[in-house]
């Protein structure tokens, strides 16, 4: 055999070995994340069902323990576990079209974020999102919210239901029953 044929055979064998290694690693990754994928699919099915059931419903006004200005209406009030992370949010065009914005981060090979969840009271009005963590208030305008996505949060190998709200230079990771909160924010942003 000529040296060209031997070289081609060697390259084909090396290519097939790399291909086999890639398939094995992909299979092991799929096995490792099987629970997450199943949990995430169930959670997104519940979210889609909730969206369809409440698509045409109006946001109902609720009373807060604090007095609101005349032009503000209380829409959501709940104590949730919230972790605040300072990270610059890049500007995309269609944040709200993508309910799966955080999925890539959750399926990462490495734990990239360490969450520090604290019980925090969250208030949503037609103009502001307010966080009360007993030490101080954080007040964000609804227009400052860049995205609000339902997601499964993977924290120290525990799978939790929640959402991620991205604001200018901050990311809020929220655990708990947040379907009404996310739906209200999307309706206020006129994205739903």
Locate each region found by the language model:
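N-terminal signal-anchor transmembrane alpha helix of single-pass membrane proteins
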Residues: 1-38
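Terminal and domain-flanking low-complexity segments
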Residues: 4, 35-58, 128, 176-192
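Residue-level marker of intrinsically disordered, low-complexity segments enriched
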Residues: 6, 10-12, 60, 66, ...
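Anionic N-terminal interaction surfaces
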Residues: 29-121
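Short beta-strand element of the conserved SAM-dependent methyltransferase core
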Residues: 79-83, 124, 165-167, 174
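Conserved beta-hairpin
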Residues: 111-137
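Acidic, Ser/Thr- and proline-rich intrinsically disordered linker/docking segments
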Residues: 137-192
